[in-house]
Amino acid sequence: MLVLIDTDPAISREDLLQFEEFLGKNLPEAMKNFYFQYNGGQPQVKGVHDDRHLFPFNSFDSLEEMRKSMKWFDDEALPAGFKATDLLHFAYDPRSGNYALSLRTEDYGKVYFYVLEEKAELYGQWPSFENFLNSFVEE
């Protein structure tokens, strides 16, 4: 069971509804349920794996941090084929890696892990937020 420390104050249903209005999209149910339980924070884990690799993981963003992050990323800082409005950044690794939920129609709800160095490179992906949550390797 995933347990987080250093979480922000709990969010209300109204907070989440306002965030979805801001996005213009409904979040996946698994993500809503997660954020009702934990508003950001750090899990005590070794990492998170996809079908092939184990990736480092640091922390989940709070709802407010996710809202702010919508202005932090521009198209040039994203993997090829993505625009800034296509991804909801919700977590990060200890370096320059980002975890983001796709907001695009063609792959809505899919989770991507990419690293931004000279250019953004995709390294990991999960079919859903629920699948992502079930892929953590605990310490």
Mark where each language-model region is.
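Short, surface-exposed beta-strand/loop micro-motifs that present aromatic residues
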Residues: N98-R104
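Intrinsically disordered, low-complexity regulatory segments enriched in Ser/Thr/Pro
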Residues: D107-E117
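A short, sequence-level motif marking secondary-structure junctions
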Residues: F60, R104-D107, F129-N131
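A surface-exposed partner-binding patch
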Residues: M1-G97
